Every structure is written in structure tokens, then in C-alpha cells.
Amino acid sequence: NGTVKAFGRSNYGQLGQGNTATIGDNANEMGDNLAPVDLGSGRTAIAVASGIYHSVAILDNGTVKAWGSNSYGQLGQGSSANIGDGANEMGDNLAAIDLGSGRTATAVAAGYYHTVALLDNGTVKAWGQNNYGQLGQGNTTNIGDNANEMGDNLTAIDLGSGRTATAIAAGLYSTAAVLDDGTVKIWGYNAYGQLGQGTSPNNIGDNANEMG
């Protein structure tokens, strides 16, 4: 029915219930006793993802909402305030993430502390923690924790000349995309060769001229 239910640890509000109470570890907390996450009036979800302490959903209108831990801006709200751990933070009170003028999302992924969206035009945007270049911007600056970093101000990741993405994924500190020609590109943390470039520990995306 497009509703979302979450259970487990909620120390940062990642279950979206307006509190930090763990759910599912005691009797009578599941089933009909577990309220769905409030996504907003009349809204349902078509996809979900979760990081270590944050949750993300694409709604039926293509917008994206995220809640839980926000220490690195991974909720995309231009602040570092957690969402979902206090009353009246969810539902219509939670603004959709600004993906850019007229843009919607077709897929989302979440790393430890970063969030990735595949947009309707095949571009990819990422925000949150960027200590290893996992946001693909050629630097290590976090995105989404300050005003005016999202929306049209957030540059889509350079996937290469004329290239778009058809699928995305996120590791702890890395991001991957399947491109429209069937190739795969991965960037971010590379201590164990997880970027598949035959090198380590050379991270990719944390310096200029490493993407595209």
C-alpha cells in the first residue's frame, strides 16, 4: 500500500516516529501496533534506502524525504539537525529535499553518512559526508549541512562526456553508478581496492580532475 514501517534502533530518530525509542525488541511493538512513518498528507513511498543512522524515501510524486541522523547534512536540509527524534518533525512538516528546479528522483541509495539520488534526467547528485570524495565533487567538503548547498546549487556528478546513469548504489564511504552504456564507475574510499582501479589506497573524487 506504499506505506513505510521501520524498526530497530532509533537513537537519532531514524525510525521516523518522533522519538528515540527502539522498536521491535519487546512484545506488542510490531504489526498493527507499529504506526507507519508519516510521509505527508496523501503521500506514499515507491522506494526506500537506509544509511547507518538515517532513512530515505522516494515518494509517489518523485520527491525525496530523509530523516534520522544529520551530522553531515545527509538529510539535505541545509543544517545538521536530526529529524524524526522529536514531535512534529515528520509528515507535512518535513520538507522534501531540493533536488533542483523541476527535478525528481527515480532511485536513492545511502552510505554510512551520505545520500545519493538518481534524478529523472539520468544525472546523479549526492550529499552528506564527503571525507573520502564519495560525493564526487573533487573535494572533501560535506554538502547539505549549510544553507544554499542543495537544489540548483548542487552540481550533478560528472560521469563523463554525454554519460547518464541508469542505477546507483552506495557503500560505507563510496558511491557507484551504472552508466547508460552499461559501464560502471565507482568513487570515494579505496583503501581495499573497492573502486576496482587496480590501486589502493588512492581515493577517487576527493581531488580535482579525478571524475568524468
For each feature predicted by the language model, list its residue ranges.
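Short coil/turn segments that connect the beta-strands within blades of beta-propeller domains
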Residues: 1-2, 53, 62, 113, ...
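Conserved core positions of repeat-based scaffolds
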Residues: 6, 54-57, 66, 114-117, ...
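Short glycine/serine- and acidic-residue-enriched loop/turn motifs that recur at repeat junctions
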Residues: 7-30, 68-90, 128-150, 188-212
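Beta-rich catalytic cores
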Residues: 44, 51-52, 104, 111-112, ...
